[in-house]
Every structure is written in structure tokens, then in C-alpha cells.
Amino acid sequence: MGSSGFSWTLPDHPKLPKGKSVAVVVLDGWGEANPDQYNCIHVAQTPVMDSLKNGAPEKWRLVKAHGTAVGLPSDDDMGNSEVGHNALGAGRIFAQGAKLVDQALASGKIYDGDGFNYIKESFESGTLHLIGLLSDGGVHSRLDQLQLLLKGVSERGAKKIRVHILTDGRDVLDGSSIGFVETLENDLLELRAKGVDAQIASGGGRMYVTMDRYENDWDVVKRGWDAQVLGEAPYKFKSALEAVKTLRAQPKANDQYLPPFVIVDDSGNAVGPVLDGDAVVTINFRADRMVMLAKALEYADFDNFDRVRVPKIRYAGMLQYDGELKLPSRYLVSPPEIDRTSGEYLVKNGIRTFACSETVKFGHVTFFWNGNRSGYFDATKEEYVEVPSDSGITFNVAPNMKALEIAEKARDALLSGKFDQVRVNLPNGDMVGHTGDIEATVVACKAADEAVKIILDAVEQVGGIYLVTADHGNAEDMVKRNKSGKPLLDKNDRIQILTSHTLQPVPVAIGGPGLHPGVKFRNDIQTPGLANVAATVMNLHGFEAPADYEQTLIEVADN
């Protein structure tokens, strides 16, 4: 903060002592919903979480993890791991990706910035390529934003536009890709009627083409590069609608894993490879699954796969995807400026911190928790440990994931006496839940519960405190439902599996031998959310939170 009166020093809490080890456990994708056969958390054997829920009602609360509570535009917007961990770590609610883009599009500000002026220089003689997820899921992108952007760029001089689509089926229903393609094709038809050469150029399923994250599998990005940039793919079609319908008809096909395809003209030539002088915009507002493509598009020194041909382009992201790497260096909408996170405060007040997860969620307990900031605040007081995730398989094949390894590292960190806070993310409920495999998700929830036990046992041994929470829902509801709550059926009378996050609240549980006996959850916060957790954790460490943080969830009763 710029004011001369600012201090990083946190005041002592008047009633809570310092010096207790605090374990912060985030169960990814672990919401609270009605118990039925499609609630994998309910079906699974989860004795530890059950005991927290049923043990002491004053030590268990549900908080909001979606919509306005995490900075998203409306309460119809599902939470996600990025905004969830931002809120958990920042202690305040910041306007997030989708909301920032909405504001910039509505005001026209998106067209005034350096990023747009940079790509605009290619409009006269080059092609504008838009690459991203074609979906209204609102987690990575939104169709209406693409529609507004197409209108805006065409009104501001873009003469030739190529859209490279990635089908969803993860944050929206499988099969919805066909409707999204039809909508986009109609919009492009209207642009062509106005003299703009606009069409879909390539496509593929999000989990198989382009949208890998945390450098788990560069082949995913390469398949996208080949189709989008080189105009080469194993499947060639005259239209995207034909492509999606044909590829979905293959055995076991689904939107998430459609193979890459390119659209070709009557001569069999790809209609939209990226060439020298073109402009490229990656339209997703969520960062994690765009970073790898951004590196391939922007870095001159790049050896993760053979790009074959590296066109001289003007590239901008919808947002900047990594603030520490300054990637991409150009972007259409500035990211939220998250300052004074709880992690930075606590480290500056002497709290030695250990953070751990496996690859798929490691960035969440570090980068996103710390306000979209890479690296340490103070390397002498922090240690971040990444357990490598399984690669080359879908997570339902090995639903235990690395929960045991994460828990053991957390246990060892607690028992070592070197750390005041041990923070972990257990990804099972979310990552396996996304596969839509109910049986595997039940196993995943059991594994996460067993991991929590290992950590809480260590808390018990060191006389510490625990706070167990989640970042959003997923595993607690695996089916699409009608307004009355009954599962929806498809045309073959089979339940429609839900692979996305949910709008459900998530738990916050506190306890441990080090917890002051008078601590209990307050009842005077009207709509508690994830952002209230940061002040709560600060209290557990014996500090008062900054005045502008969302209120703590706890109070101390006088005995």
C-alpha cells in the first residue's frame, strides 16, 4: 500500500495465543449437498469428515464458495479452484476474470488498452485468430464474451477472423458442443454478410487438445499447435458442425476428448493456419489451462515440443495468465491486483509456512493462494513441495491420486517443528469428480478422508490446531437435476452425469488440542464465504486480521 502509515505488523489477538501449529487443509471439490446415491461424499466411507461434521456444531460451518462470494459476476456462476484459493488467501473479494472481462466489454475499455491496439496493427493485412473454449460454463470462458468480442473487433477493422474452438463437456453437459457450434456458425454467417471473412478454422476437445496445465502433458498442447497454427490434424472437414457431429459419433467419444480437426476448403487446404503478420488472442479468462499455449505462442526459446514453424505474430491473452512470468506480455484486460494476502502478512509476522499438493493443484496452494504470485515471500521462512501427479491416465483410473503422499509430507512438516502453518490441497474430489465416474469418485473421497486423518493425527501429536475447508463443490453431486432436484435423464432414460463444479456451499471445520476452549463459530455473519477464512486463520495464529479483511468466522467466548 502506498500510504506512509501502512504497517505489515499484525496486532496480537486479545484472547488467542501465538505459537500453535496450524494445519490448513483444502479438500478440492468437496461441497455439501443432500445425501443420495449421487452424492459421492455421502456414499463414501468418510469417518473423519463425518466426525468433524457431527461432533461439535459450533466447530463446523458451511460457507459460500461461488458467485459474488468469490468475485464472480452472479450467483449463477460456479466457483472454481482459482477464484476459491484467491479468496481463501486474500481475505477479501476481488472482481475476478469473468467479471473483469464483462466490465471491460460492457464499457468498451477492452478496445482502449495497449493489448488491443497491439493486435489491431495486424487487422489491415493479416488474420485475427481467436483460440479458446467454446462454452457457456463460465469457468474458463463464456460464449457471450466471444460473441461480443467478434462484434467489437469486426467493427474496429478486423477483416479476416478465424476461430479455433475447443469443445467442453466438463463444465457443461457432454454433447452441448453441437449447440454452441451452431450458435457460433450463425454469428459468423452474419459477419460474412457484412463483408468480414469469418469462419471456424480448427477444433478439438479441451482435455485432449491445447488445454493442459502445469506442464503435465505437452502433447496436448502440441496437438492444438499443429491444428491451430500449422493447419494440420488427423481429421479434416468442410465445417465445424460436421466435424463435431461426426467425431462425437465415434465409440466412447465425448466433448472433452474430441480429437483435433481442421476445416478445409474445396481444394483440401486448411482455411486458417496462423501465418506471419497475423494476430492471435487466447479468449479464455481463466489462466491455468492457457499458460502452456501462451508459452508456445510467445517464447522464442522453447523446447517442450517441435513447433515446426513459428510465425511472426502479434499475440495477446484475454488476461495476463501468469503475473510472475509476465505471460502473456500483452493482454486485453488487466488482471485483478491482489495485494496484502494473508500468506504475505503471516510470513512477515514470523509464521514459518509449509505448502504442499500434487502437480494438478500445487499452483492453487501457492500461486493462487498468494494472489496470483509465483515464488516465495521469504525463502527463509517458507517451503513449497510439489508431489508429481500421475500422467498419461485419467484420474478415475487411480482415484487415490497422491493424497497419501501429500498427507505424509504434511505430517512430517508438522512433526518436524520447523513450521507454524502447514497448508495442503487434496485434489481427489475435484479431479476424479470431473471424470464423471461415480464409483471412482467414491473411492477418491475415501482416500481424501484418510489423508485428512493422517494430518489431524499429527496435529493432535503436536498440540496444534486444524482448519479443514474446501474451495468449491463437485463430488457431492454427480448428476444434472431439474428444478425440483430430481436427476435428469437422457433420451435413453439414463441419468445425465454432471462433471462440473456445483453451486453448493463448502464446509469449514476447526479443532485440535491447541484450539482455545472458548473458540466457536459466530452466528452474526449474514453470508459467510471463502474470503472469511483468511482472517480466521490469522486468529488461530494469535493475530488480529487487517481491518479491511472479510470478518473472521470465529469468536472467543469467555469461560
Curated annotation (Swiss-Prot):
A Pfam family this chain is assigned to: Metalloenzyme
Compartments in which it is found: Cytoplasm
InterPro entries the UniProt entry points to: Alkaline_phosphatase_core_sf (IPR017850), BPG-indep_PGM_N (IPR011258), Metalloenzyme (IPR006124), PGAM_B_sf (IPR036646), Pgm_bpd_ind (IPR005995)
Cofactor(s) required for function per UniProt: Mn(2+)
Entry binding sites for substrate: H140, R170, D171, R206, R213, R286, A287, D288, R289, K361
Expression by tissue: Found ubiquitously in germinating seed.
Enzyme Commission numbers on file: 5.4.2.12
Record keywords, A-Z: Cytoplasm, Glycolysis, Isomerase, Manganese, Metal-binding
SUPFAM superfamilies tied to this protein: 2,3-Bisphosphoglycerate-independent phosphoglycerate mutase, substrate-binding domain, Alkaline phosphatase-like
Signal peptide: none
Molecular function in Gene Ontology: manganese ion binding; phosphoglycerate mutase activity
One of the GO BP terms on file: glucose catabolic process
GO CC entries: cytoplasm
Catalytic activity: (2R)-2-phosphoglycerate = (2R)-3-phosphoglycerate
PTM description: The N-terminus is blocked.
Enzyme class: isomerase
Residues annotated to bind Mn(2+) 1: D430, H434, H501
Cofactor binding notes: Binds 2 manganese ions per subunit.
Active site: S81 (phosphoserine intermediate)
Biological or metabolic pathway of the protein: Carbohydrate degradation; glycolysis; pyruvate from D-glyceraldehyde 3-phosphate: step 3/5
Binding locations of Mn(2+) 2: D28, S81, D471, H472
Family per record: Belongs to the BPG-independent phosphoglycerate mutase family.
Role according to the record: Catalyzes the interconversion of 2-phosphoglycerate and 3-phosphoglycerate.
Protein name as it appears in the record: 2,3-bisphosphoglycerate-independent phosphoglycerate mutase
Biological source species: Zea mays (Maize)
